[in-house]
């Protein structure tokens, strides 16, 4: 039976000094016999998805202590991708994921904590904490801050989100007054942005991985029901500790819950709900931390057989996360997938012995439990606020229409092919990814002329200056993990293409990545990246490129001899951008770039290189 890790610093005569310091934090004699639960919070006033988390750590802490544990809270950083977008701040977003993972590891290992409650929400925070949890492999539960309510305005017939504000701002025909109205209405409350963007996608995936409670990805940040998730997380983590440390049950450890089959479940959910392409990057990174052989080949295999059962902004304007919740949340999507024979349901979760048990209890089409139905009726109040649990509005009815509703059955899927796809070809030998959920079917096969830009900044200038025409394939390169460095998101270029009326007439290919708010024929994560000798660095203005989503291919239409000749020439020149890029690459960013792998590896650190440098 494993000992509490915390005994290292709480037991024995030689630890008198450590105990003296623990006592200074408020611990008493009886506390040294209890598990120490680390509460990894991510409160910050910089990020709307985290602005309401200040008191959440202590809310969980009180419940941990009632359940028989000792709670110790600490904070990690959180970067807002939307605020960092469109300038050098975006260079820091993806690297922050590694910093977050490391900071959780540092705090938990330095203080010998026995378990973790991860209070996350936005884009890099959930992935960073997930990486740390799988690295540490001690009992863990995730509870996120929850999604923002969709914005409302009389100027639009649909709910608004951040992307609407960006698109209208780039529309030269829109008045300043209309832009201001959208700006003031798009993000009305605390919480992660209201569509199926990266933050909400990742919080939904923690449910599928088995590491979070039902409702974690969909219950609104403002709704009073969400408080129960935090309280239940506090009780559950102490129970998980008891099972592992007192009953020798290692099935509750994160690597045994989030195993290979669970990663397949998470990716299956992601494809079915048309999640952000960033989720692929983060799942690949988390799998490496768990030492699981899960890669783009597995994702490609799943993408060919999983239908799209849910369509949410930015893929469709009609639905936001509040609508997903009303339709039964993630466990209702999982229920439909299970009935289609597309899930592994025999896996443990933090709340049920098996996923099948969890689905039976929480899928609104399977259960008559009035409490479950009431929970999923929780809806938006439409009142701007930065306060959690500030309203208790409920829909009069659930959306259980699986033929035409927000969530569909396999038989009535939005499409029989899912919302994400992996493409391979001579321009991306190790793969690239596209969110097919946001691509109009008329351009699933697209041949166009390459228009080369060697930074996001120059691409934005070119698009706004009307240098990009219908039929072009915009190539933005040297923006990968090494080349950027930091693998910037390309939300501004895609939003501006849309505002110019080119959303269905152009494509975009990059070794960078896309915001979860991106839609259109936007292909990212081209691997290897240009800075690592990837063929995207060999494309020239005017070259023809053929994109074929049904056949999962993307190719530069030149022969092998020409490709080899260009590669020899580029090897001599060096793999770096020709155009001047006035960006400041700090020591911190250089350190990230030195060790970063391409996107097909999750843009994690190159462990082989690390082992060489530090044997």
UniProtKB/Swiss-Prot annotation:
Question: What are the boundaries of the signal sequence?
Answer: none
Q: Which GO terms describe its biological process?
A: isoleucine biosynthetic process; L-valine biosynthetic process
Q: Which reaction does it catalyse?
A: (2R)-2,3-dihydroxy-3-methylbutanoate = 3-methyl-2-oxobutanoate + H2O; (2R,3R)-2,3-dihydroxy-3-methylpentanoate = (S)-3-methyl-2-oxopentanoate + H2O
- Keyword Magnesium assigned to the entry: answer is yes
Is Zinc found in the keyword set? no
* E.C. number: 4.2.1.9
Co-factor(s): [2Fe-2S] cluster; Mg(2+)
Residues the record lists as binding Mg(2+): 81, 123-124, 489
Q: Which UniProt keywords apply?
A: 2Fe-2S, Amino-acid biosynthesis, Branched-chain amino acid biosynthesis, Iron, Iron-sulfur, Lyase, Magnesium, Metal-binding
As one GO molecular function, the record gives: magnesium ion binding
> What's a Pfam family in this record?
ILVD_EDD_N
Summary of the function given for this chain in its UniProt record = Functions in the biosynthesis of branched-chain amino acids. Catalyzes the dehydration of (2R,3R)-2,3-dihydroxy-3-methylpentanoate (2,3-dihydroxy-3-methylvalerate) into 2-oxo-3-methylpentanoate (2-oxo-3-methylvalerate) and of (2R)-2,3-dihydroxy-3-methylbutanoate (2,3-dihydroxyisovalerate) into 2-oxo-3-methylbutanoate (2-oxoisovalerate), the penultimate precursor to L-isoleucine and L-valine, respectively.
Q: What is this protein called?
A: Dihydroxy-acid dehydratase
Species of origin reads: Pseudomonas syringae pv. syringae (strain B728a)
